[in-house]
Regions:
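Short pre-catalytic strand/loop immediately N-terminal to key active-site residues, enriched for Gly-Thr
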Residues: 188-199
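Glycine-rich phosphate/adenosyl-contacting loop at the front of the ribokinase-like
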Residues: 1-47
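Short, small-residue alpha-helix embedded
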Residues: 134, 198-228
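Conserved phosphate/ATP/ADP-binding segment of small-molecule kinases
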Residues: 110-184, 193
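Short, well-structured alpha-helical segments that form the helix of a local strand-helix-strand
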Residues: 157-161, 218-233, 252
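General beta-strand structural signal in soluble alpha/beta enzymes
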Residues: 27, 49-52, 97-100, 124-128, ...
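Active-site cofactor/substrate anionic-group-binding motifs, chiefly glycine-
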Residues: 40-93, 98
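Charged C-terminal helix
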Residues: 230-278
Length: 278
């Protein structure tokens, strides 16, 4: 397998492609984070649409560049819309990204995610350490939608999920993991304040979907999306903040300001932020 290029130039190229193509990214997500997800998608250069009705969702998927299925809100109507939209996107060959929010916390969520995995092909799956561990069928500590506990084997776990689902897996945590069946990348970027803002995980899911909709190959899309997202978190902190609210504003501004030209100016040590397991 060819290594993915990790450099300021490669990241700039992905950002440029995303902004030039302006992919339409359909989100079926939750009401808690929907506004920040839509805005971050727009600020990356993609076009967000939040069509999530049982009829409207599958119809909108016909023209989408990528679809994000987020299980942060589970009810009968939305759950069915999530399922049918994923099926419709598959039928058109449109990349589908799964964010299994809360996987491992309730039987209802578990049943929905398992149904999605059984019937829908996913270009990428993004979840926190606990959610990815629960997807693997291992014991995970998920409290509500938050991952708690220790996950020393998360790289192996993410790779196992990638192999079983034939997809790219992004496991977000202190060190982000991007895994396929035959490669594992550890991404060292981000800031601790990202964990103090509700919705950063959902925004990462939207970011992965945006890059998958604009960048042709899924692994580079997921890897560059994860790296860019962490860099934005660091830049938001560098702007100065009084607490989570001002940091959140800085974060969205930093997404907007990470242009292809800005990415090219990132120092040459960027490659050191990503380590491939051998």
């Amino acid at each position: 397998m060819t290594d993915v290029a990790v450099s300021a130039e490669a990241l700039s190229e992905s950002l440029s492609t995303l902004r030039e193509t302006e992919p339409l990214i359909q989100h079926l997500t939750n009401r808690v984070t929907i506004n920040d997800v839509a805005n971050s998608t727009l600020h990356w250069g993609a076009l967000p649409v939040m069509a999530d009705g049982p009829a409207d969702g599958p119809e909108m998927a016909q023209g989408a560049s990528a679809v994000l299925l987020n299980t942060g809100q589970v009810n009968d109507s939305l759950s069915e819309a999530i399922y049918e939209t994923g099926v419709a996107a598959n039928e058109r060959g449109i990349p589908v990204v799964l964010d299994p929010v809360g996987m491992g916390s309730t039987p209802t969520r578990n049943d929905l995610v398992e149904r999605l995995l059984a019937d829908i092909d996913f270009a990428a799956i993004k979840g926190n350490y606990g959610e990815i561990t629960a997807l693997a069928g291992a014991e995970a500590e998920v409290r509500g939608v938050e991952s708690v506990g220790e996950y020393d084997e998360i790289a192996d776990t993410a790779q196992a999920v990638a192999e079983s689902a034939d997809t790219v897996v992004v496991a977000s945590g202190e060190t982000d993991i991007v895994a396929t069946a035959d490669a594992v990348y550890r991404v060292d970027s981000g800031h601790e304040m990202m964990g103090e803002v509700v919705g950063t995980g959902c925004m990462l899911g939207g970011t992965v979907a945006s890059f998958c909709g604009g960048v042709e190959e899924t692994l580079p899309a997921a890897l560059h999306a994860t790296l860019a997202f962490g860099l934005v978190g660091e830049r938001a902190a560098e702007m100065g903040y009084n607490g989570p609210a001002s940091y959140r504003t800085n974060f969205l501004d930093s997404v907007w300001n990470l242009t292809p030209a800005e990415a090219e100016e990132i120092d040459s040590a960027l490659a050191d932020r990503v380590e491939r397991d051998t």
